[in-house]
Curated annotation (Swiss-Prot):
Family annotation (CDD domains): M35_deuterolysin_like
Phylogenetic placement of the source organism: Eukaryota, Fungi, Dikarya, Ascomycota, Pezizomycotina
Residues binding Zn(2+), per UniProt: H313, H317, D328
Cysteine pairs bridged by disulfides in the record: C191-C263, C270-C288
Name this polypeptide is given: Neutral protease 2 homolog AFLA_065450
Source species: Aspergillus flavus (strain ATCC 200026 / FGSC A1120 / IAM 13836 / NRRL 3357 / JCM 12722 / SRRC 167)
Reported function: Secreted metalloproteinase that allows assimilation of proteinaceous substrates. Shows high activities on basic nuclear substrates such as histone and protamine.
Chief location bin: secreted
Length: 404
């Protein structure tokens, strides 16, 4: 991972993201999305509340978000199964953003009465390269956070029809790209002062959390792993551990690695509810002002947000750290733990929650008063394991004294 200083130049990186669509079981309470073509690559989405009650949800990272986020999945050869052509997902070249889960502003929320709808129009060629034209299959499904009193309290599933369109190559190539990478000769804001100090602390904490979580994934409690990743298979545990170790390795260096990390919003995609964002196709991460003003460096509360797990979350998005990069399939504990095993394996928040849960469970054993409202059950670690996972921190010293 590389910091960008005032004298550094941003180099173009080769796109490598390969996202995976979500599969969500049908539900009486949900959102139905109807996709239609209104131009060559311009798509209209009508989102309808199919439930019997009002629902208030976060429309960021969803339809109505003005940022270049992924609203649909695009596939080639999706409608040609009889020709034995492999279905290929078209690479998404927009941003993935992490949001706050409490204190959301009203302009980030949408309320739909039963049967009510909202509409959104967007150009899929602005966030994907469709310049070769041809048949594209489009769909959208997943989980969107719902709120009570501006706090994320659960999720609601959404699913769409499958839309097939024929794309004119020349017209698609003329669409302006939503994300414009800084010119090679452009100098960008340096990472210095209090923000540099905060990010350096976050990176050190990320290393500790990721390594501890990797150990827990590889050889820790099977029931705890099942809680987050919905399986206890050895191959999945190894994959999760490998990704977390890769995150730890990336966070351990500020002068080398696969990602470029900005201390500030150099691309202008931060809003009042966004903590940080990643451009996976370029392995670029940027923090927002809220990252520094809203988040603690490291929380002791189970499944709460902090700077370390936000940085860990963003690193998992970057395919340069570990490929394929993760998606945002389920946001927050209730949504993340509702995913299938295959979805959880590629969900960024699952890794952040698992890392936080591993750390919080240790603290709750050392001092239960640190996590009075936690759902992370304490795990019994001997002093040697504690120090191997977290180093000789204060928590380990307290635990050591209590045990020995």
């Amino acid at each position: 991972m590389r910091f960008i200083s005032a004298s550094s130049l941003l180099l173009a990186l080769a796109p490598t993201l390969n996202a995976v669509p979500v599969e969500v079981a049908g539900s009486a309470q949900g959102l139905d999305v109807t996709l239609s073509q209104v131009g060559n690559t311009r798509i209209k989405a009508v989102v309808k509340n199919t439930g019997s009650e009002d629902v208030t949800f976060v429309h960021l990272n969803f339809f109505k978000d003005a940022a270049p986020v992924q609203k649909v999945s695009l596939f080639r050869n999706g409608m040609l199964p009889n020709l034995n052509l492999a279905t290929t997902e078209v690479q998404f070249q927009g941003i993935k953003q992490r949001l706050i889960t409490e204190g959301l502003s009203d302009d980030a929320l949408t309320t739909l009465a039963p049967g009510a709808t909202i509409e959104d129009e967007f150009d899929i060629a602005s966030t994907s390269d469709l310049s070769e034209g041809g048949t594209i299959t489009i769909n959208s499904n997943g989980l969107v956070p719902i709120t009570t009193d501006n706090k994320v309290t659960g999720y609601i599933p959404f699913t769409s029809n499958e839309l097939s369109i024929d794309v004119d190559a020349a017209e698609a190539a003329s669409v302006t790209q939503a994300v414009k990478i800084l010119e090679r000769r452009t100098k960008v804001t340096s990472c210095s002062g209090s923000r540099l100090s905060a990010l350096q602390t976050a990176l050190r904490n990320t290393v500790s959390l990721a390594r501890a979580a990797a150990t827990a994934a590889q050889s820790g409690s099977s029931s705890r792993f099942q809680e987050y990743f919905k399986t206890t298979s050895s191959s999945t545990r190894s994959t999760v551990a490998a990704r977390l170790n890769a995150v730890a390795n990336e966070a351990a260096s500020t002068s080398s690695g696969s990602t470029t990390y900005y201390c500030s919003d150099v691309y202008g995609y931060c809003s009042s509810n966004v903590l940080a964002y990643t451009l996976p196709s370029y392995n670029i991460i940027a923090n927002c002002d809220l990252y520094y003003s809203y988040l603690p460096a490291l929380t002791s509360t189970c499944h709460a947000q902090d700077q370390a797990t936000t940085t860990l979350h963003e690193f998992t998005h970057a395919p340069g750290v570990y490929s394929p990069g993760t998606d945002d399939l389920g946001y927050g504990y209730s949504a993340a733990t509702a995913l299938s095993a295959s979805q959880a394996l590629l969900n960024a928040d699952t890794y952040a929650l698992f890392a936080n849960g591993t750390y919080s469970s240790l603290l709750s054993f050392v001092n239960p008063l640190l996590t009075p409202d936690n759902s992370c059950q304490p795990q019994l670690l001997d002093a040697r394991t504690c120090n191997r996972q977290f180093g000789r921190s204060t928590s380990c010293k307290v635990y050591w004294k209590a045990v020995e």
